Design a protein with these regions (language model features):
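Hydrophobic alpha-helical segments and helix pairs
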Residues: 9-33
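Single conserved hydrophobic/aromatic residue that forms the stacking wall/gate
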Residues: 2-10
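A short acidic/glycine-rich loop-to-helix N-cap element
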Residues: 164-187
Length: 194
C-alpha cells in the first residue's frame, strides 16, 4: 500500500511547490486589482500583464497575450438562487448563456460555449471556507473552429447573497496548455473577499 501512495504524494508535493513558485513569480509584478475590488469586492493575485479586455456592469474580462494566443480571466456574479436544479446541467448552461452575451467569436453569430462532445469534470470544494463548484472542461466557439481548456470556479458568497464566478480559459492552437492552465488555476484559487 505505501508503494502505491508514494507517486501520488510526490505528485501532490511537487504541485504545491510549483504553485508556490507561480505565486512568487506573479508577485514580482502584481496587478493592483482595482477593477475587481470596485466591481465585485474581491481580489485575486494575478500579474499586471493581464489587461482589461471588456468591462460591463456585471462582467469583467481580462486578457494576457501569449505565444500563438491569449490567456483569459472572466469574472461576474449571479444571484444565489441561480444554481437550483441539477448543478452539472446548470453550470454549462450558465457558461453558454454568458458566452452568447459577452464572449463573441471571430465570425458573425459565433460565441463561446461548453464543448458538447466531452462532459466537463465537476468538483465540490471550498475556497476560504466558501462552498465552491469547480468545473474543468473544454470550450469551443459555436459556428467557428476554435476551442481550448477552461477552469470555472463558482464561489458562494452568502454575505452578499450571490455567487462569484471566476473562469480562466486559454486559446493557444497546437501547443501545450498545461502551464497556462496551471497559472490560471493558481490565480483563480487566490480569491479573497473584501
Amino acid at each position: 500500500l505505501p508503494l502505491t501512495l508514494f507517486p501520488y504524494t510526490t505528485l501532490f508535493r511537487s504541485s504545491k511547490v510549483e504553485q508556490k513558485e507561480k505565486i512568487r513569480r506573479i508577485m514580482k509584478s502584481p496587478s493592483d486589482n482595482k477593477e475587481l475590488i470596485n466591481k465585485f469586492q474581491i481580489s485575486i493575485t494575478y500579474p499586471s500583464a493581464y489587461e482589461i479586455f471588456k468591462d460591463t456592469v456585471n462582467f469583467l474580462w481580462m486578457q494576457k497575450p501569449i505565444l500563438k494566443g491569449h490567456m483569459n480571466i472572466i469574472a461576474y456574479t449571479l444571484p444565489l438562487n441561480t444554481l437550483k436544479g441539477i448543478i452539472k446541467k446548470r453550470i454549462p448552461a450558465i457558461r453558454d448563456s454568458i458566452g452568447r452575451v459577452y464572449i463573441p467569436g471571430r465570425l458573425p453569430g459565433s460565441y463561446m460555449i461548453t464543448e458538447k462532445a466531452y462532459r466537463p469534470y465537476f468538483f465540490k470544494t471550498q475556497i476560504k471556507g466558501n462552498l465552491t463548484y469547480l468545473t474543468k472542461g473544454t470550450w469551443e466557439v459555436a459556428n467557428d473552429f476554435m476551442a481550448g481548456p477552461f477552469i470555472n470556479y463558482m464561489v458562494r458568497d452568502t454575505s452578499k447573497n450571490r455567487w462569484i464566478v471566476l473562469e480562466g480559459f486559454t486559446f493557444a492552437p497546437s501547443i501545450s496548455k498545461r502551464d497556462y492552465m496551471f497559472e490560471l488555476n493558481t490565480i483563480l484559487g487566490s480569491v479573497k473577499f473584501k
